[in-house]
Amino acid sequence: MKYIFYSFLSLIILASCKTNKDYLSRSDNDNTLFDAIKTLKKHNTDTTALQALPVLYNLAQQRNLRKINSYSSSRELSRWDKMINAYSTLQEMYNAIVENDAASRVVTPVNYQQTMYDLKHEAAADYYTAATVFLNKPGRADAKQF
């Protein structure tokens, strides 16, 4: 009986460790946005999620767009992958908001699908150019480098 009591007590303590912070006081905007949308899927009239969603979307969008701008000023080839990942996050936010009626009433998200498509084509052209430069160099070591 004693062991059951202690295991039940430890279970209650662990369950109470979940964060009770409101949405706007959290530091990770992307995950917080998805948490708010998940809450709206369960309870579409949750006022805290409905009020926080426009602010969270704007913060996450601005943060990702700033990352994209900083990556685009770089000249390294890996910038394409970083930019595509940031646009993918923005597109996931768009998809999550559009799929939820309560969220789409509060926020009008931007669709980045065409931008991602164009960016992937630019990346492919840049990778192709870099690969042909390596292949045109004499010697096998340079061709294997890429």
Model-derived regions, located:
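Sec-dependent signal peptide recognition
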Residues: K2-S7
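Bacterial Sec signal peptide processing site at the extreme N-terminus
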Residues: L11-D35
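Generic N-terminal amphipathic/basic segments
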Residues: Y23-L24, D35-T39, T48-L56
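Residue-level recognition of tetratricopeptide repeat
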Residues: N29, H43-D46
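Leucine-/aliphatic-rich long alpha-helical segments
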Residues: A36-L40, I68-Y71
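Post-signal peptide N-terminal segment of secreted/secretory-pathway proteins
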Residues: D46-Q145
